[in-house]
């Protein structure tokens, strides 16, 4: 993911390399200021700025600093933000395919498998079609940024499907939430930045 993020940011910057003045892009993230993802993005943004002699800069804004996390694609489409570094499963309410592309629980063994699908198996093009179905011609997909598998943490023992009944679970929207709901759980989609405070 590290190499890919730099590549995606450089691709985004190719449009601006001939510009006489610096271009500063504002990307809203799904993480709070200071957490690992926000820090990571800041480090990569500095590398990008150095590689372009300061002609292209990216400011990673913390979650909800401009718009709520589920409204970032509208903000990009309307020119309020220049980019979005967010979990696309949050947009599953608009098109269920966002859930499949954004958080296919147990669909891949590693983030690298998903990255390979995105870059070499048609995934990036599929994701572009999904965005175009919601906001035609307003969003350009530069790539995918998969996360590794997350743990299912619970205050009560879960030894099988029956133990999920009545348990409140953090889950992405769409397919995953539907599976948990059918198993009797109460799925809730909350941003990662709010996990420890919920």
What annotation goes with each model-predicted range?
Residues 45-46, 87-187:
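Contiguous mixed-secondary-structure segments that line small-molecule binding/active-site clefts
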Residues 7-15:
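Bacterial N-terminal signal peptides
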Residues 16-22:
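Sec/Tat signal peptide C-region and signal peptidase I cleavage site
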Residues 45-58:
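Signal peptide-proximal N-terminal region
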Residues 1-4:
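Positively charged n-region of N-terminal signal peptides that target proteins for export
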Residues 26-44, 63-67:
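Extracytoplasmic "Venus flytrap"
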Residues 61-74, 173-175, 188-197:
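Short helix-initiation/N-cap motifs at beta->coil->alpha
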Residues 53-56, 72-86, 168, 185-187:
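Alpha-to-beta junction loops
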């Amino acid at each position: 993911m590290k190499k890919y993020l730099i590549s995606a940011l450089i691709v985004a910057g190719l449009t601006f390399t001939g510009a006489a003045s610096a271009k500063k892009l504002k990307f809203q993230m799904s993480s709070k200021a200071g957490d690992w993802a926000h820090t990571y993005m800041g480090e990569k943004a500095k590398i990008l700025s150095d590689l372009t002699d300061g002609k292209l800069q990216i400011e990673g804004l913390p979650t909800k600093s401009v718009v709520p996390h589920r409204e970032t694609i509208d903000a990009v489409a309307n020119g309020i933000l220049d980019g979005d570094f967010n979990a696309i499963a949050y947009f599953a309410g608009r098109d269920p395919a966002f859930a499949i592309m954004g958080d296919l629980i147990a669909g891949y063994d590693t983030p690298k498998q998903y990255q390979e699908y995105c870059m070499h198996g048609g995934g990036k093009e599929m994701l572009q079609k999904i965005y175009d179905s919601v906001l035609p011609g307003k969003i350009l997909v530069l790539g995918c940024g998969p996360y590794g598998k997350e743990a299912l943490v619970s205050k009560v023992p879960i030894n099988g499907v029956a133990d999920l009944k009545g348990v409140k679970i953090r889950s992405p929207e769409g397919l995953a939430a539907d599976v948990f709901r059918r198993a009797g759980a109460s799925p809730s989609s909350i941003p990662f930045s709010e996990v420890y405070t919920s």
